[in-house]
């Protein structure tokens, strides 16, 4: 298993399949960013309840190998219908969106 971490240049526009249009169309590419955490959501309240009180941590402390980077998720927006697809990428230190010339 190779644990090589990359820097990747991703084109701003790609042609790929749109499940809503059912054809291959141009998609604009952006990098997905997670939203703000809501402190009153059910999961957040459950987490706070479990964490409350004295004693140990909620989960055991990790002893061995931990991940160094997160997987980059790409948001592909169809230029025809505006449908957005999330596409999971690979582990990257840095993903850079670049303008591809040619046409």
Swiss-Prot record:
GO CC, one annotated term: ribosome
Sequence ranges of Basic residues compositional bias: 47-57
Keyword vocabulary terms for this entry: Metal-binding, Ribonucleoprotein, Ribosomal protein, RNA-binding, rRNA-binding, Zinc, Zinc-finger
Alphabetized GO MF terms: large ribosomal subunit rRNA binding; structural constituent of ribosome; zinc ion binding
BP-aspect Gene Ontology terms: translation
Cofactors required: Zn(2+)
Record carries keyword Transferase: no
Cofactor-binding details, from the entry: Binds 1 zinc ion per subunit.
Domain of life: Archaea
Zinc finger (C4-type): 18-81
Family: Belongs to the eukaryotic ribosomal protein eL42 family.
Function: Binds to the 23S rRNA.
Quaternary structure annotation from Swiss-Prot or TrEMBL: Part of the 50S ribosomal subunit.
Name of the protein in question: Large ribosomal subunit protein eL42
Originating species: Desulfurococcus amylolyticus (strain DSM 18924 / JCM 16383 / VKM B-2413 / 1221n)
Gene coding for it: rpl44e
């Amino acid at each position: 298993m190779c644990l090589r971490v990359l820097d990747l240049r991703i084109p701003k526009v790609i042609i790929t399949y749109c499940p809503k249009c059912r054809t291959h169309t141009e998609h604009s590419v952006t990098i997905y960013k997670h939203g703000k955490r809501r402190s009153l959501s059910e999961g957040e309240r459950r987490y706070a309840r479990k964490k409350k009180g004295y004693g140990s941590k909620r989960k055991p402390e990790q002893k061995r190998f931990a991940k160094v980077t997160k997987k980059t998720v790409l948001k592909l927006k169809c230029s025809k219908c505006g449908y957005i697809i999330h596409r999971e990428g690979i582990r990257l230190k840095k993903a850079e969106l670049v303008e591809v010339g040619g046409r």
